[in-house]
């Protein structure tokens, strides 16, 4: 509790410099779900990976970032390079070899492009309900991917929380509201 309160009194950190190296992408189909409050750089968990196309030209990845609905995606990073931003789109011609579909956790259908490309391995039943995730389609490019698969991370605005003062639910970095949400959450928190 004290940790969250002390964070509220410290100036807002530069997420790009201080948080790089803290977000590590993992591969585990049965990985536990993360709860994310406030703004955070998340490495995510690769829950599906498949090559498609002639000569395995494309690599598809499904990267789960939170086990609940989130407010928004702000940016996507490959290693320490920002490749996509919510207001600018793709950087440095990354849009030529990468396409990203974002799901905030409120989706009711599976990613249709992946369903079409996967030869029935990823089906319409793979909706990942109540999970925030990204679907990335990477085109083989020896120049862009010279060191192999990059560490993929994203800066997100996490879980929406209830503000009992006005009975509204919205994204917040207020530590008291985040703690209140965690304490009363019957799925992930301490409530029964």
Model-assigned labels for residue ranges:
Residues 2-192:
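Polar, S/T/G-rich
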């Amino acid at each position: 509790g004290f940790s969250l309160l002390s964070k509220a009194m410290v100036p807002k950190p530069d997420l790009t410099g201080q948080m790089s190296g803290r977000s590590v992408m993992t591969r585990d189909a049965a990985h536990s779900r993360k709860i994310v409050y406030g703004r955070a750089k998340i490495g995510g968990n690769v829950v599906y990976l498949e090559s498609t196309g002639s000569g395995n030209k494309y690599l598809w990845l499904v990267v789960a970032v939170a086990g609940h609905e989130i407010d928004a995606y702000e940016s996507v990073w490959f290693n320490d390079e920002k490749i996509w931003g919510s207001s600018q789109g793709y950087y440095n011609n990354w849009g030529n070899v990468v396409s990203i579909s974002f799901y905030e956790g409120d989706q009711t259908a599976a990613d249709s492009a992946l369903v079409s490309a996967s030869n029935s391995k990823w089906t319409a039943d793979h909706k990942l309900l109540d999970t925030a995730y990204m679907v990335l389609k990477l085109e083989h490019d020896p120049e862009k991917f010279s060191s192999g698969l990059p560490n993929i991370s994203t800066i997100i605005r996490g879980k929406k929380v209830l503000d009992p003062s006005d009975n509204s639910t919205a994204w917040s970095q207020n530590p008291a509201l985040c703690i209140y949400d965690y304490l009363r959450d019957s799925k992930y928190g301490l409530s029964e």
